[in-house]
C-alpha cells in the first residue's frame, strides 16, 4: 500500500501581507499529479489544515475543492485530523456522511483511537487517528487528576490502553511535539512526548513541526509544511512524504520534491548590489549589510523584488545591548530638535543645512506653544 503523508497545509495563510491561496492551489495541483504518477492509495493529513480557527471563505472553498478532488478524481482514501490551528467543530462538520466516500475526519480525542482498516495484498493495515489535544483534555479522557504528571506520561498511559494488534501493520496519525524532532525548542509553551510512546507501530505520521524530517531513526516522521510559511523556514527541507508499506516490518519512506509557485528566499548584501540583480518574483526578504539607513529602501527594492516580504539591517541589528542602552539613555536627554537633527543626518548621510534647522526649529517652537 502506498501512502502520502501531508501536514501543516495552513490553508488561508497570509505571508507578510501576501495571500498564499494561489500558491496553495498550485501546490495541490502538483499533489494530484504526484498521486497519479506514484499510484498513491491513501492520503494522510496530520493537522493544521487551516491557518486559523475561523478560516475565510477562500480557504474553506479551497479545502473543499482539494478534498473533493482527492476522493472523486484521484480516487484515494483520505484520513484527516485536526491540529492546534484548526477549529474542531468546523473541520468535523459532515464527517459522518463523508466517511462513506472514503474521507475520514477526526477532531476530538476519545478513550479509544479512531481506527480505520484497509486491505492490500499483504492483509490488513490499521490506521489510528490522534488529533491535536490539550493536556487537560487527555487527563479528562484518562480520568487522571494528578496536576504534576507530564504529557509524556499521559500519552504513554493512553497508548497502553489502546487495543493494538501488533501482528498486523499499524499506522498512527498525530499532531504533537515529539522529542527528537527538529525545532522542538521553538514550539514555545508546548510539552513534548518521547518516541517510546509509539513503540511497536509500523509508521507514525506526525504534523506540528514544519521541517520535513525523521525522529531519532525510528519510523516516526514529520511531513513538515510543504510550503515555506516564514523567513525562519527559508533553509528548511521541504517535501512530500511517500510511504511504501509492504509486509509487516517492511516500510520504505521517500521524500518527493515540492513544486512551489514561488519559493521563499532570504538574500543578503548591500542595497545597491541587490538592486542591480535581475527582477525576481519569488518571496524575498532582504538582509542589508549597509551600515546606515537607506532612503526608501523598501520601495526601491520592490522595483526589483515584486513580492518583497521585508528587509532588515544586519549591522544595525547587531548593535551591542550595552551600547544600545547608552544610546537610548543619551537620546532621552536630547531636545526634539536635536533628536530630529540626529535622525535626519543619519538617514540622509549629510549634515542638516542651517536653513532646514531654522524651519524645523520654528515648527517645534510652534508645537510647544500649542501644547502650552
Please give the residue ranges for each predicted region.
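Alpha-helical scaffolding segments of alpha/beta enzyme cores, especially the outer helices
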Residues: 30, 61-69, 93-96, 100, ...
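His/Asp/Glu-rich metal-coordinating catalytic cores
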Residues: 55, 79-217
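N-terminal active-site segment of His-dependent metallophosphoesterases
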Residues: 1-68, 75, 357-371
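Glycine-rich phosphate-binding loop signature in dinucleotide/nucleotide-binding domains
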Residues: 35-39, 120-122, 164-167, 277-279
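Short, conserved loop/helix-junction motifs that constitute active-site signature segments
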Residues: 72-74, 164-166, 195-200, 277-279, ...
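Accessory, non-catalytic peripheral segments of nucleic-acid enzymes
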Residues: 37, 42, 244-372
